[in-house]
Amino acid sequence: MSTRIITEPTVEPLVLADVKVHLREDLTSASNDALITTLIQVARQEAEHRLQRALMLQTLEQTLDAFPVATDTNPLAAIVLEMPPVVDVTSVTYTDAAGSTIVLSNTLYTLDAAREPAQLVPSYAAGSWPATQGSVAAVRVRYRAGYSTSAAAATAQAAVPSAIRQWMLLAVGDMYERRAAS
């Protein structure tokens, strides 16, 4: 099982002007804006890696070699979505036994996004997951994750917990101070 980013976030949890104030940088000078913007992105990526959480809205794809089967420890044959908080599932595709790529109807699975990490289970109507071809990455689940579904930057940024944003400010400050001399 692996997860990769399909669509990167379009907004970062920190505002450039706020970071410049934190760094005691001149707000009217743009000389270091590109560097600081890059450091903000790096801090978000590091926070996401450490926390195993998507901070800003992004599209992810999780691959599995087959659908899970019901067991004593996984009675619902749940697929655990690795990067919370999950907003929604955009598609589930799989390679069937004949080698054809099939898009699974959203009526055949149920997302339990209230649980963390979120789980995807076969719907009651489906009963179980379909059979797949015995191949690597035969199942692909695309989903959106992040603290906010808002396209408005201020709303999305405010949805990220303040402790995470504060850690990011400190991380950006540390990287900024330790950068190589130009």
Region spans (language model):
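Divalent metal-cofactor coordination and adjacent catalytic microenvironments
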Residues: 1-182
